Design a protein with these regions (language model features):
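Residue-level marker of intrinsically disordered, low-complexity segments enriched
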Residues: 6-8, 19, 52, 78, ...
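Classical Sec-dependent N-terminal signal peptides that target proteins to the secretory pathway
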Residues: 1-24
Length: 113
């Protein structure tokens, strides 16, 4: 008898207090905004470091390290198109820092895994 009452009580709780589960919204706009945020962070860090007087190799290593450190724990990292991200970074470096000899191959270590 007690077992039956307990079962009915639990089933009633599950029936009335069941809340729906929604999936995470990973729209293309959200992903594009996140990619642009990463690109801006890398570009700012690289420009400031190279203007401070550090060599391009040192500025590159520092910018990659800082960007990896800031964005490594985000759930959107699995969805990033790295070729698009690298192209955005190169374009931002040309437009913001006037660095025209920067190639995409220098960004091989920019991974958030």
């Amino acid at each position: 008898m007690i077992k039956r009452a307990f079962t009915i009580f639990i089933l009633t709780l599950l029936l009335f207090f069941n809340s729906p589960v929604y999936s995470l919204d990973n729209s293309s706009k959200t992903l594009e905004k996140y990619t642009k945020k990463i690109s801006n962070k890398f570009t700012r860090t690289f420009c400031n470091t190279s203007k401070f007087g550090i060599s391009y190799e040192g500025a590159l290593a520092f910018a990659i390290g800082e960007t990896n450190k800031e964005f490594k724990n985000n759930k959107l990292n699995k969805l990033i198109d790295y070729s698009l991200l690298k192209n955005l970074i190169v374009n931002d470096l040309e437009n913001d820092c006037q660095v025209y000899d920067f190639t995409i191959s220098k960004l091989e270590n920019l991974k958030f895994n």
